[in-house]
């Protein structure tokens, strides 16, 4: 909810999803309290079943969640010129885990995007990239 509200406060329309009803309720309350609820839609969604339906997005932010099965859908959902900001647990500097990105995984998985910045280490991986084309 924090990133969604931050983006909404800058005039963007946002859709936030989380598997937790508590997290979604907290995000709605934060958006209401900060006066941006009109720019926000929050839904309880289990991403294990895939991305929810919706139009192309100018920005996708995915924090602390990694499911390789969603990579193609994320790329397809981005509009031309759209930005992807993704962070995940990583095996680089940490041990293996079901939801941990392998070394170089984010770079490889999103190779068709234009990479702006990214890093991995200390158990974290992140990537900022844009989809080729213009909005």
Task: Kindly give the residue locations of the regions a language model identified.
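Conserved beta-strand signature within the Rossmann-like core of class I S-adenosyl-L-methionine
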Residues: 81-94
């Amino acid at each position: 909810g924090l990133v969604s509200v931050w983006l909404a406060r800058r005039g963007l329309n946002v859709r936030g999803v989380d598997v937790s009803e508590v997290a979604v309720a907290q995000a709605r309350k934060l958006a209401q309290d900060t006066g941006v609820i009109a720019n926000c839609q929050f839904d309880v969604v289990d991403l294990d079943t895939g991305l929810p339906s919706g139009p192309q997005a100018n920005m996708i932010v995915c924090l602390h969640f990694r499911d390789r099965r969603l990579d193609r859908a994320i790329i397809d959902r981005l509009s031309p010129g759209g930005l992807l900001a993704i962070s995940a647990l990583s095996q680089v500097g940490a041990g293996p885990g079901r939801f941990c990105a392998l070394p170089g995984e984010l770079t490889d998985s999103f190779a068709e995007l234009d990479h702006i910045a990214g890093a991995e280490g200390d158990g974290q991986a992140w990537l900022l990239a844009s989809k080729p084309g213009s909005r």
